[in-house]
Amino acid sequence: METFKEYVTKRIDNTIPQVKEMFKLIWLGVADSMKLKGAIIRTIKSEVLRKNFIHCIFLNGIIFLGTYLIYLYWVSPMLNYLLNHFPTLSNMFTIIYFSLWVYPVYIFSIIANSKWYTEIAKESFVISGRTTFANSTNGILSSFVDEIYRNLLFGVILVMSAIIAFIPYTNFINFVIITWLYSFWCFDYKWILRGKWNLLQRIQYFETHWAYMFGYGLIFTTCSFFFPMLIGNAIFSILYPLFIILSISAKPTKMVNQDGILPKQIPIFYVPEIIVNVILKLYVKYKNTRGAAKSTTPSPSPTTKQN
């Protein structure tokens, strides 16, 4: 029977080939995400893909990003020069410009992009020779619940990322989190269209393929992460359709060597899941308390009309 020391030594020795396999899987993910030529060719050949991708470029690249860059590098410096002695007026113009143009366009782009991304994913799925799963009534209800939980989960992750960004020397941690999140967003369309897995199953699959998934999202995140928020989001919105298209034909690989100290599965979404579950429990408790309070409130007695 091996001692604890022998067990630890064996695990450490087996970690070296495991690390090599990890970097190999990361590179496979990077390589699959760099096949942009194939995604562009598919986009050009398909009318649906081409139309929706042009919409994404026009809205995000020209209307939103273009006008924002014009303001940032032309209008704003000119205003600062002209209103050098009236900084209050310059600040007022900035507030008005962002309130009436930048943020409304940004919100509209989020809504429009969601529709276009879905169309792009569906068409890519069909082009790849796959067929979508026909949902039953129970399946539709389950998908609706999944979608609510999914949006809450992503919202919590983004809030956590924003909080981490304010902590010194955590930029790398934030980059890793966003890389995994972007990668999940790319593949989630494919998994939803298959219709075979619920959200928790999709998360489990993602977490057991953590090395490949990190590699797949690495280039995508690098292209937008280091820019200011609005510019980075615009770049993300332009590139995202291409990475969705590539994810449809990608074949993620998980780590085979389990004898080292590297984990088989990294619980990437563990903390956000706990927070979402707490939020949902508090909401249900609040609704139940409110419903009980309403049921115990006496109804007003009817008044009698006197002649």
From Swiss-Prot:
User: What membrane topology does this protein have?
Assistant: Multi-pass membrane protein
Q: Which domain of life is it from?
A: Eukaryota
UniProt GO cellular component terms: endoplasmic reticulum; membrane
Residue intervals passing through the bilayer = 53-73, 92-112, 153-173, 175-195, 225-245, 260-280
Q: Where in the cell is it found?
A: Membrane
**Listed GO biological process terms:** DNA damage response; macroautophagy; negative regulation of gene expression; positive regulation of gene expression
List all annotated glycosylation positions. Answer: N135
Query: What keywords sit in the KW lines?
Result: Glycoprotein, Membrane, Transmembrane, Transmembrane helix
The text of the family note is: Belongs to the EI24 family.
Question: Which PANTHER family does the entry link to?
Answer: ETOPOSIDE-INDUCED PROTEIN 2.4 HOMOLOG, P53 INDUCED PROTEIN
Instruction: Write down what this protein is called.
Output: Protein EI24 homolog
Q: Which organism does this sequence originate in? A: Dictyostelium discoideum (Social amoeba)
